[in-house]
Amino acid sequence: MGNEFRVCDDCQATNVKTLIPKLKKVDSCATIEVACQSYCGPGRKKSFAFVNNRPVAAPTEDELIVKIEAKLNK
């Protein structure tokens, strides 16, 4: 089973236009879903993504990608 990334296009700290290409570099075969994730509180202050149904958040997008790569053991 492949990896799944879920991101919100409505949260203030998440820039979907720049985050999705970075997620594709992490795993080009992963499924990426863009929709409200009901994670609004943390989403106002931190970049986040759900990775295989688990939330991963960081102060910046670059730090988020590092955390996601670590979670996927790349």
Curated annotation (Swiss-Prot):
Superkingdom field: Bacteria
Alphabetized InterPro entries for the sequence: DUF1450 (IPR009910), UPF0741 (IPR020880)
Record family assignment: Belongs to the UPF0741 family.
HAMAP family in UniProt: UPF0741
Protein name: UPF0741 protein BcerKBAB4_5177
